[in-house]
């Protein structure tokens, strides 16, 4: 009896596994590639998870001006959203990583211009250093 139940459960999982895989889509904006071993975005069941986006352009350059760096990070997020046929209005959660708390007000002004009401939830964390040379990295989750 126990073996029969186990067999049924295993069979059900094997049948369901392709359905889960079929709903997963890797999102890569045209003309870009991730800077490491990760996906820029993963869309699964209508939810888009975007990896941390730094303020660097497609050539890997980071603007000297912090405001331009923030805008570039948000533009990079916008490119992933667009590739997934979403907009900033679909974003439900944001995590911002800054290397300097004194730059929070400037980041916040630019952020406020990008995300309109109702704004997504947000956590902002000050870190000692990012993996790359930038001063900001932003991760978002969006839902259609």
Describe the predicted segments one by one:
Residues 3-9, 14-75, 79-92, 98-144:
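N-terminal presequence-like segments and the immediate start of the first folded domain
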């Amino acid at each position: 009896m126990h073996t029969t139940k186990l067999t049924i459960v295993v069979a059900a999982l094997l049948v369901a596994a392709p359905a889960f895989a079929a709903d997963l889509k890797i999102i890569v904006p045209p003309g870009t590639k991730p800077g490491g071993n990760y996906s820029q975005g993963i869309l699964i069941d209508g939810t888009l998870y975007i990896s941390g986006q730094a303020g660097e352009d497609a050539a890997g350059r980071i603007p000297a001006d912090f405001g331009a760096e923030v805008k570039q990070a948000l533009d990079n997020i916008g490119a992933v959203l667009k590739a997934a046929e979403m907009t900033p209005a679909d974003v439900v959660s944001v995590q911002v990583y800054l290397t300097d708390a004194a730059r929070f007000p400037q980041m916040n002004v630019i952020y406020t211009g990008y995300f309109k009401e109702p704004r997504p939830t947000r956590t902002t964390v000050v870190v000692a250093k990012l993996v790359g040379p930038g001063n900001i990295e932003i991760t978002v989750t969006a839902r259609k």
